[in-house]
């Protein structure tokens, strides 16, 4: 660890002790001795805290929320699709309150936005009641916002291993809204100016409607 981080062995030892005290890492096994005291091995505690993941989507002309709870090792602890009337701040607050009661270790929320954002601020969304909201301030919990198509592209690339097609254009055609896309270049998400890369809805001279897709 000292070699990889450039820190001194003493500093690494101090950090490990702090993580051990917080239960963020746990002692696993003792390594093989080479004559002195056998080295200790540690593993990360993936249940140190949990993540609540929410993203709205359309299916059969209805609006749903995909709601997942995950640990830090990307293991799903819970998942459901819930039909709702509309997407707004109060709905999201209710979901967070409900799931924090069920999963007290939830410390962060991931939100898939059908639109654009600048950090925690949603600048555009297919669900207009979310526009102009700073979710971290409104919800009093750290929120990671990512464009829904960007998230899907990252997941698709990860599932495929990323080596076969390191540069990909991912295009999504939802049922009730114009399409969106995402760009992966050398396995890295390209967001462009003000995170607007992939916003093909606003391409001039193309009238997006269901008759052409």
Predicted regions and their residues:
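Glycine/GP-enriched mid-protein hinge/lid loop-to-helix segment characteristic of carbohydrate kinases
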Residues: 144-213
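N-terminal helix-turn-helix DNA-binding module of bacterial transcription factors
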Residues: 1-46
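Glycine-rich phosphate-binding loop and adjoining helix at the ATP-binding site
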Residues: 77-167, 212
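Short clusters of small/polar residues that mark proteolytic maturation junctions
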Residues: 30, 81, 194-195
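A short local loop/turn or secondary-structure capping micro-motif enriched for an aromatic residue
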Residues: 60-62, 85-88, 162, 199-201
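Gly/Thr-rich phosphate-binding beta-strand-loop-beta motif of the actin/hexokinase/Hsp70
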Residues: 36-77, 169-189
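A generic structural signal for well-ordered coil/turn residues at beta-strand boundaries
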Residues: 38, 105-107, 199
């Amino acid at each position: 660890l000292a070699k990889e981080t450039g820190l001194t062995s003493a500093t690494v030892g101090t950090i490990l002790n702090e993580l051990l005290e917080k239960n963020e890492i746990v002692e696993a096994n003792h390594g093989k001795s080479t004559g002195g005291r056998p080295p200790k091995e540690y593993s990360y505690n993936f249940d140190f805290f949990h993540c609540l993941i929410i993203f709205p989507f359309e299916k059969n002309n209805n609006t749903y929320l995909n709601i997942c709870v995950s640990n830090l090792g990307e293991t799903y602890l819970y998942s459901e699709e819930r039909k709702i009337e509309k997407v707004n701040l109060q709905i999201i607050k209710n979901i967070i309150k409900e799931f924090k009661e069920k999963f007290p270790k939830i410390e962060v929320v991931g939100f898939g936005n059908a639109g654009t954002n600048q950090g925690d601020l949603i600048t555009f969304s297919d669900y207009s009641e979310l526009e102009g909201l700073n979710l971290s301030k409104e919800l009093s919990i750290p929120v990671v916002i990512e464009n829904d198509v960007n998230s899907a592209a990252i997941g698709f690339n990860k599932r495929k291993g990323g080596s076969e097609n390191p540069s990909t254009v991912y295009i999504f055609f939802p049922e009730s809204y114009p399409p969106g896309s995402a760009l992966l270049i050398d396995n890295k998400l390209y967001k462009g100016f003000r995170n607007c890369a992939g916003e093909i809805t606003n391409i001039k001279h193309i009238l997006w409607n269901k008759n052409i897709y």
